[in-house]
Amino acid sequence: MDEISYQKFLTTKIRDLELDVDESMAPFFKRLKKELKDHRILLWPDFYFGNEWGCENKTISISIPFFLATPELKTLEGDETKNEEMMKILRHETGHAINYSYKLWQQKDWKEIFGDFNKKYRKGYLYRVNPWSKSYVRHLHYLGDPHYAQKHPDEDWAETFAIWLDPRSHWDVKYRNWPNALEKLSYVDRIMEEISGREPLHTKRKQDGIYSMIEETVSE
């Protein structure tokens, strides 16, 4: 991109950028699709570029930060997300989408293992975590969100699912001395076997904060 083109790029409104989530995220989506296919999980989330990471509550829509779309945007944002870190977050958010699409959070066993899905998120959860607990897996923990699984039952599920889905996690070995965390991982393994090959029950979409609605320019 030459200097003139770059200056024009900086003054372009984000909503006017031509971003293609499938094209930009192709190598990561390829890996994720294979991991899901290996377990015959039929859901493919509704990915889109938005303001930040997140799965819209009780939908299959997952927002990916728009600045991950191109090298130029990543450089401006100062983003240094590595490939494996990207996969960790994608697995986590996909865990939310699967929870919602198959309504797993409504099942008695899910509630007994992870807790009340309708529990309100509280600010400052880090002041209440048990840093020595072996009841929770550690996943986004290593990406700057310490003890994230302790934040809320839905996050506990998503973190546990993400480790289970990672073909290189060796969760049955890594967590063999963490009985409560291992119980959660074993539950994920069991419930995913149950929904294997089954169509999702719920495929509501909601692309909140989609990049095409962002009025700011790239430089802003």
Predicted ranges, named:
Residues 95-103, 162:
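Active-site-flanking alpha-helical
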Residues 18-73:
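Auxiliary, metal-adjacent structural segments of Zn-dependent hydrolase domains
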Residues 72-91, 146-149:
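Short pre-active-site segment immediately N-terminal to the catalytic Zn-binding motif
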